[in-house]
Amino acid sequence: MVVFVGRRLPALLGLFKKKGSAKAENDKHLSVGPGQGPGSAVDEHQDNVFFPSGRPPHLEELHTQAQEGLRSLQHQEKQKLNKGGWDHGDTQSIQSSRTGPDEDNISFCSQTTSYVAESSTAEDALSIRSEMIQRKGSTFRPHDSFPKSGKSGRRRRERRSTVLGLPQHVQKELGLRNEREAPGTPRAPGARDAVRIPTVDGRPRGTSGMGARVSLQALEAEAEAGAETEAMLQRHIDRVYRDDTFVGRSTGTRAPPLTRPMSLAVPGLTGGAGPAEPLSPAMSISPQATYLSKLIPHAVLPPTVDVVALGRCSLRTLSRCSLHSASPASVRSLGRFSSVSSPQPRSRHPSSSSDTWSHSQSSDTIVSDGSTLSSKGGSEGQPESSTASNSVVPPPQGGSGRGSPSGGSTAEASDTLSIRSSGQLSGRSVSLRKLKRPPPPPRRTHSLHQRGLAVPDGPLGLPPKPERKQQPQLPRPPTTGGSEGAGAAPCPPNPANSWVPGLSPGGSRRPPRSPERTLSPSSGYSSQSGTPTLPPKGLAGPPASPGKAQPPKPERVTSLRSPGASVSSSLTSLCSSSSDPAPSDRSGPQILTPLGDRFVIPPHPKVPAPFSPPPSKPRSPNPAAPALAAPAVVPGPVSTTDASPQSPPTPQTTLTPLQESPVISKDQSPPPSPPPSYHPPPPPTKKPEVVVEAPSASETAEEPLQDPNWPPPPPPAPEEQDLSMADFPPPEEAFFSVASPEPAGPSGSPELVSSPAASSSSATALQIQPPGSPDPPPAPPAPAPASSAPGHVAKLPQKEPVGCSKGGGPPREDVGAPLVTPSLLQMVRLRSVGAPGGAPTPALGPSAPQKPLRRALSGRASPVPAPSSGLHAAVRLKACSLAASEGLSSAQPNGPPEAEPRPPQSPASTASFIFSKGSRKLQLERPVSPETQADLQRNLVAELRSISEQRPPQAPKKSPKAPPPVARKPSVGVPPPASPSYPRAEPLTAPPTNGLPHTQDRTKRELAENGGVLQLVGPEEKMGLPGSDSQKELA
């Protein structure tokens, strides 16, 4: 009855509603014609609304609508009942298939009845109400007409059935397919089999011509099977390719598979092992390779990368056939995944050495293409190229081995040249693609670990791969040519020679490659954002062995800059095409001349100029700016002051090959050149790059090759991020003039420029170097060299500090404080570390510092904008505090040689240095003895004086960085906070609680590397320079 009532309800309501509406209508009509007799009759008829004859048309419409509404409601009710019962029953039946048919029926009946009775009534009432409400709106037509309601009901039903029922395949898996699905079961298996069609992959169907899939499997099978399989595959490929490619049969004459695959970069795979020679031409596809994956030789397999990883066996076979011809790229890729075949171990070892590379080698393939062609011997060819690069490397160390180191040195040079011509555009595009430096940094770390493993291979095989990486990194279009040939190929030698020595011959070497990869002359320089990451690699790599590492660093610089002109890599990238020829000639010694020329190249400074405009304000006031403008002229003289303090001899000794060139350059711009060479490379990366590079190039024609050049990439990223970096460029000039170690710093941050002049630069270098030694530790062999390198570096820094400023050591540590300031300051600081540690032995120190730089840079890059304002504020605070200190020690406005060079420094650099140095000074002073503090205060006061004069311009520039520096200043003002804020100064003592995470990271690194720092401290103490005091404090 309930159900009945529910069903009746809508009809009753509709009738009542109809009556009401009809009465209203009648009333209206009556009111219209009240006294009409016929009207009365009509009224009677109207009153009896149920008589169809008596209804007016409008009433008829209403009635029809009401009837439709009732019907729709009834229909909906029926559907609901069906849903409640039948659909539910269906669900039950599905479940019952698990349990049993009887239970199903029972459950179905019981649930159906209850569900229908309750839910149907409730739903009916609800639907009636809703429909009534809706009808009230205008007409009695239900919102759902019959068809609509039917459709909606059907849809609901379908949904329910799908949800309630288990899919057949699921049931089959669960073994629930019972009587219910028994009929369907046969279908499912058949359908499944058909869908799966494992046979498609099977040989017969593959032969039939599935297309890419078939060709892949067929290729794998054939490679293993032998000539017969290959012949069959060839036929299949011919059929497929002819059908596809030769729609117009005009090309039919050509071997379709070979032609098509070559176009696809699949030539080797498609053609089979037979057309090995064609494959090398296929490798000439390097332009395509640029756009394709580095596994282009395997492009035949649609998923080239996947194929390589998936079918190691097939890949190996392929590598034998096509990889030999295209071995460099394919072999390397294979080397990553698994050792290919014995024939390829050589190339594979390079690849394994360049496993890190291979990651970057997607682009590298393009570069590889060149190198592959040149070291086309495949795996066999590569060892030769690597040997050549090794033999050439010594010259690169002396000069910028970069061009010569290029893997099969000559072959790679030619490769680079050919790539430049054919693949340069593609390489550039690839470099653009590779501009994303974040991935390369990890690779670099990976390479550091692999370095030790691939130490032997790295020297031989790795050099070519670095080339490839660099080529891919060609981010700088102009450098592409130089980078690819001289930059890419030479870089590998640098890494091999410098890095292998630096980090453990093999271990070191790879990191350089990773850095090269990351920094790849083009990419590192071009993608400044990526630079910060890359420089850390370079820093980490070189530290292993100061002597060897350092010469490679110059090479590295060269690679960064461009083959030989790396120093002015920006210029090189600008003039890369013109300088590209140089890379071939550059083999090593030539770099000096090219470097000088490139230094001379003012264009690069012009390029940086845009960024440096803010610095230019300080620059114009400071002679340093002109110095930067004249790449090596001013820096050399200015740095001469600090140069005397610096110990170029140590760097020179370390860099015997480089030493000659560096010495010459250093003579041009003496002492500063060794550290500057490291730092200058960073400057080249930045706007200051040009200026700094020029000085570093002239100062250390060889040293630019050193990692210092790699460090430059980090500065570029900061520049991009911050104009503060632009400010820093002027400091670079000052840096150069003030402190040779600072040259790299200049691009990094003006603060570093000034502070490096002080012995703080030595202390900072020492501290940074300790991180460097930890970095080398990843490659166990490296640590010892790193330690020795730190000692060298420490000595150098002390010398530098002495020349720069007696109390400079702590200030330089203070420079570390700038880390908090702007990322630029941090970058500069790292560079400065590299510079002091890095002319010759600094290889270890700089390389180790570089990794910290990387973190700092990566962290700083984003912070830079904020730091700039913070820095500005900090500068103001510093100015205030310095005002007091100036009053205290106004006697020495520029008394320290450090002070004089700093005035030349751009106001930005001076301000940055003052801020960082002042903070450092405060912190250092607390730990340092009163005498040291007094010296530092005097130097700082003099510097602050000069800087305070320059600060007004700096304030606008660094206004963005002001906030962080301000916070730092308060911490500096409070001795306890100050020490934390200066992780560099007291990282060993306790990890600074600096607000800046980057600083903390650095501090952590330094703390971890305390052993290295302590070792450095020892040398510094031996030096007996003010730096030693700062070192003691640090210890």
Swiss-Prot record:
Tissues expressing the protein: Expressed in lung.
User: From start to end residue, where is composition biased (Low complexity)?
Assistant: 338-365, 517-532, 562-589, 625-645, 652-662, 737-765, 838-848
Q: Does the keyword Phosphoprotein apply?
A: yes
- Please list the residues that carry the modification Phosphoserine: 93, 138, 145, 161, 215, 322, 327, 330, 338-339, 341-342, 400, 404, 409, 545, 612, 669, 673, 858, 862, 868, 929, 959, 971, 979
- Supply the alphabetized keyword list: Lipoprotein, Methylation, Myristate, Phosphoprotein
Sites bearing Phosphothreonine, chain numbering: T162, T531, T593
Please state what the protein is called.
Answer: NHS-like protein 3
Q: Which organism is it from?
A: Homo sapiens (Human)
